[in-house]
């Protein structure tokens, strides 16, 4: 007879009011290096992925404990001058270093860039596509003399055979406008009347890396994508609920706007409106702050590289004018999108290693602390500095050596639970500290029984309960207080209760 044992962990995760760093892990790779590192809150190494090819910029941990990373594939097929951290290939890597799947995106006209994000189980890549000077001039670009590489996104779904398939794409080229030549496509009489489109002439310069999109994030609740452009000094939101055909048009999707820009912020002069340029130069790593009750949940957050001065960066929070009733970002006629300035700001200490003029990343932890990864840039050997500050700006964790773009994962992230059996060190983190308690013992009035269990468990909580296996796959979701587990294999499971931030492990 099989037995499924439940162990309640006396671990209550709450919003902390005292000044302390948040427990969890940091994931990073050094640009140009072959190894990705996972360290715990005490800066001890917990796991590494050692690969035969170098990482370029971004690595992320999936809920199943696997790593997703960009790497440099056959980039020689594309004229890559001035491409920062070129890519051409993306991989999903198992904890033991084996390649689950790999996908090459590099040919004479396209190449993946250095950033990516997860869309559920899929991977969204930033990429370039080549446009000749002839194509540029035909589209209304002013006197193009060389090729440009406008941004596009491709979403990949693993095909189960070691590769992946493109299931969705969006191209900035489909959403350009110009006001210089009425005889050419995409002509508009007034750029400021069309903030949903990108002025093809708003950026000049000789580099093919025209916009340099360097950060991308996905919001599952809104089904939207946000991305940042270093050279435009601006961030943008687009609709992801579209088909690829709708994404190439101006209608369709939840927004009804197809692939047009839903929201933009940081530099109103890009669409010919007056207003403060809150992003004076480079910007990196725009992302949504998780909206789960943590401070400023639902805001956007950016690493504003020169937000304070040329030598001092800022982590800015932006409360967007999203309206739930109309499902739109509100904007007054003739005015730029609000807010007129940042909503929240943490001013990084001036100079290296706490500020950075390029690359870099940030995140907001569930206790309100801000995680910062200031890159030392290409000249810094692909490394950077990671640290965590509280609401007063006091450094509570770090500084410690990191990479160009790090990610912080808290103890209850399913990918951390799935990765635990593969970690070389679990004793120096509090994430896995647990004292088993017998059946009918309580944690904050919560009771689970019987323990061990064979076919049913009872939990005296009416909230939604989700049970995950050790690979981070959800196997049960129910609001019932009595749960049938007879169909589950023996093993360790993680139970998450939606209306309570309490973590349990079921054995």
Labelled PLM ranges:
Residues 2, 403-432, 471-473, 487-507:
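In a subset of proteins, long, contiguous C-terminal domains/tails are tracked
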């Amino acid at each position: 007879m099989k037995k499924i044992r439940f162990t309640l962990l006396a671990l209550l995760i709450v919003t902390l009011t005292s000044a302390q760093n948040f427990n969890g892990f940091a994931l990073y790779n050094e640009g140009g290096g072959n190894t990705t590192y996972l360290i715990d809150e005490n800066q001890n190494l917990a796991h590494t992925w050692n690969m035969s090819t170098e990482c370029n910029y971004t690595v992320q941990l999936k809920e199943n404990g696997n790593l997703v990373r960009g790497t440099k594939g056959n980039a020689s097929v594309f004229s890559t001058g001035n491409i920062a951290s070129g890519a051409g290939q993306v991989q999903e890597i198992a904890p033991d270093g084996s390649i689950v799947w790999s996908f090459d995106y590099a040919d004479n006209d396209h190449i993946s860039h250095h950033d990516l994000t997860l869309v559920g189980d899929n991977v969204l890549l930033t990429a370039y596509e080549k446009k000749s000077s002839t194509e540029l001039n035909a589209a209304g670009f002013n006197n193009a003399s060389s090729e440009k590489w406008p941004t596009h996104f491709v979403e990949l779904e693993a095909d189960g055979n070691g590769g992946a398939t493109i299931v969705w794409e969006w191209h900035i080229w489909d959403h350009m406008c110009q006001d210089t030549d009425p005889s050419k496509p995409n002509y508009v009489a007034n750029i400021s009347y069309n903030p949903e489109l990108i002025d093809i002439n708003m950026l000049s310069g000789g580099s093919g890396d025209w916009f340099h999109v360097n950060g991308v994030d996905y919001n599952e609740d809104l089904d939207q994508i946000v991305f940042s452009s270093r050279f435009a000094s601006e961030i943008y939101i687009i609709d992801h609920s579209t088909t690829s055909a709708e994404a190439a048009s101006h209608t369709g999707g939840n927004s009804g706007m197809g692939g047009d820009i839903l929201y933009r912020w940081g530099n109103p002069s890009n669409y010919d409106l007056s207003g403060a340029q809150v992003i004076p130069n480079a910007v990196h790593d725009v992302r949504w702050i998780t909206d789960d009750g943590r401070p400023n949940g639902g805001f956007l957050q950016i690493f504003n590289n020169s937000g304070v001065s040329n030598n001092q960066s800022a982590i800015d929070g932006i409360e967007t004018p999203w309206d739930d009733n109309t499902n739109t970002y509100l904007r007054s006629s003739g005015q730029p999108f609000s807010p007129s300035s940042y909503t929240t700001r943490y001013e990084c200490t001036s100079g290296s290693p706490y500020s950075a003029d390029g690359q870099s990343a940030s995140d907001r932890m569930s206790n309100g602390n801000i995680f910062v990864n200031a890159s030392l840039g290409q000249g810094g050997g692909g490394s950077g500095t990671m640290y965590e500050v509280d609401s007063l700006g006091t450094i509570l964790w770090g500084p410690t050596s990191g990479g160009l773009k790090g990610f912080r994962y808290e103890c209850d992230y399913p990918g951390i639970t799935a990765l635990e059996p593969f970690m070389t060190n679990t004793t120096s983190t509090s994430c896995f500290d647990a004292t088993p308690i017998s059946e009918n013992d309580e944690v904050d009035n919560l009771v689970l029984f019987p323990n061990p269990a064979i076919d049913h468990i009872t939990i005296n909580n009416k909230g939604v309960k989700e049970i995950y296996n050790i690979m981070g796959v959800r196997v049960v979701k129910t609001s019932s207080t009595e749960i049938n587990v007879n169909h589950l294999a023996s093993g360790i499971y993680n139970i998450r209760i939606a209306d309570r931030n309490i973590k349990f492990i079921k054995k």
